[in-house]
């Protein structure tokens, strides 16, 4: 399979590239060339900033494009304007943060997503991250209604996580003499 991975040299994308290599896919890696630019020397790399000129992608053919770093709907629209006629499938890595409210149990794909009064904002914050990802999803579905796959992962943790959001807790637990937290055996998660 011919894959194009947008992003791919930092955290999640790196692991996607490694799995694609293990599966012997033909990979093109599209990234800025700033973070770990030489991480995959045997993989075709196209260095570009997705916020600038995307012409280097025009006319290229891929079975699937996996977009790991779309944060603003403009980025998704601009990318798909260049590549949508020459790809089989567009995979957008979104987030469970798109959901408008986590106060209810049993959220499904049909649950309402967050919205913004200013849908063209590019101000990233805790309040805008989820709704912006939801707008990115919509941009993908508008461009490729039958050839888009939206993935809404929860917290992604693991080797090379630059946020240290998971490994922080095992270290705290290891160093703590006593830990107090609420016990609710019917809850699917504690926080």
Protein language model annotation of sequence segments:
Residues 96-127, 142:
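Active-site "gating" loop of Rossmann-like NAD(P)-dependent oxidoreductase/epimerase domains
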Residues 121, 172-191:
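A conserved pocket-lining segment of Rossmann-fold NAD(P)-dependent short-chain dehydrogenase/reductase
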Residues 129-133:
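Active-site YXXXK catalytic motif of short-chain dehydrogenase/reductase
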Residues 9, 34-87, 92, 98-101:
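NAD(P)H-binding glycine-rich loop region in Rossmannoid oxidoreductase-like domains
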Residues 26-32:
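Conserved glycine-rich Rossmann-like NAD(P)H-binding loop of the short-chain dehydrogenase/reductase
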Residues 154-163, 183-191:
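Glycine-rich "substrate-gating" loop/helix at the edge of Rossmann-like oxidoreductase active sites
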Residues 3-25:
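N-terminal Rossmann NAD(P)H-binding glycine-rich loop of SDR-like oxidoreductase domains
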Residues 136-159:
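Conserved beta-loop-beta element that borders a ligand/cofactor-binding pocket
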């Amino acid at each position: 399979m011919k894959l194009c991975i947008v992003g791919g040299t930092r955290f999640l994308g790196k692991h996607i590239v490694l799995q694609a290599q293990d599966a012997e896919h033909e990979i093109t890696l599209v990234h800025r060339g700033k973070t770990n630019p030489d991480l995959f020397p045997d993989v075709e790399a196209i260095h570009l900033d997705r916020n600038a000129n995307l012409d280097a992608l025009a006319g290229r053919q891929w079975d699937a494009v996996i977009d790991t770093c779309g944060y603003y709907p403009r980025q998704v629209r601009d990318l798909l304007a260049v590549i949508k006629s020459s790809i089989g499938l567009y995979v957008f890595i979104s987030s469970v943060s798109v959901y408008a409210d986590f106060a209810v149990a049993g959220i499904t794909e049909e649950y309402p997503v967050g919205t913004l009064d200013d849908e063209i904002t590019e101000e990233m914050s805790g309040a805008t991250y989820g709704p912006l990802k939801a707008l990115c999803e919509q941009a993908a579905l508008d461009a490729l209604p039958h050839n888009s796959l939206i993935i809404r992962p929860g917290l992604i943790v693991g080797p090379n996580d630059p946020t240290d959001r998971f490994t922080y807790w095992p270290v705290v637990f290891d160093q703590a003499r006593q830990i107090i937290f609420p016990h609710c055996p019917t809850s699917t998660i504690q926080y």
